[in-house]
A protein has these predicted regions:
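Non-catalytic beta/alpha edge segments that cap or flank active sites
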Residues: 1-204
């Protein structure tokens, strides 16, 4: 059942933490709370979220992503966890299976950011896709599982004065959502400045 928007430009965000151990209560999930905190700081336009905590099972991941986009009506879905080379890491495969358009630039940029910190970032297989239905479309992106890495990939790298050195991936998300017919997203510029061409900017 689709969620009711309280405002025409309210962004519906799906947050999915994918972990065998967290989903069975072995340890507490950190990915979704980190994302909730980040969006609370970063977005100035209205938004609401739908969260899920599921195991590393490809069919379950696919069903969850489809539910969030097709049934709930999310405009943006972010996953955390399950993107490494281990046998149980199947989040990218599930994401690609439900997508209608691959968006490789997001994964490429995430790895470029993370490689500034750890050489093992090259082992990460994060992907992003657009999922389209006859009357709706959404951007689905895989993120790292650690809160620090989540923030770094979304915001990018800044120098001591706060000037951007390497853009974070979220800078491109608002315009991407524009292009697929979603709500107009506005951000707190000192956290993450949204980039749009001048022709796509709304008058203040």
């Amino acid at each position: 059942m689709k969620k009711t928007r309280n405002h025409p430009d309210e962004l519906l965000i799906g947050l999915v933490s994918i972990s065998d151990r967290a989903s069975t209560g072995v340890y507490e999930d950190q990915g979704v709370p980190a994302l909730e905190d980040w969006f609370a700081q970063a977005l100035t336009s209205p938004w609401q979220m739908e969260t899920r905590l599921i195991p590393d099972v490809q069919s379950t991941i696919e069903k969850t992503l489809i539910e969030l986009v097709d049934d709930i009506g999310c405009d943006l879905v972010l996953t955390t966890g399950g993107t490494g080379p281990a046998r149980r890491d199947v989040t990218p495969e599930a994401t690609l299976a439900v997508g209608t358009k691959p968006m490789p630039g997001f994964g490429e940029q995430m790895r470029q950011i993370s490689l500034r910190f750890v050489p093992t970032a090259i082992l990460s297989r994060q992907v992003a896709v657009i999922r389209e239905t006859p009357d709706h479309a959404a951007l689905i992106m895989n993120l790292p599982g650690q809160p620090k890495s989540i923030r770094e990939t979304l915001e990018g790298l800044k120098d001591a004065s706060g000037k951007s050195i390497v853009p974070g991936i979220f800078s491109a998300v608002p315009y991407c959502i524009d292009l697929i017919g979603g709500p107009y997203i506005e951000t707190q510029e000192n956290v993450c400045k949204a980039f749009r061409p001048k022709s796509a900017l709304r008058a203040k």
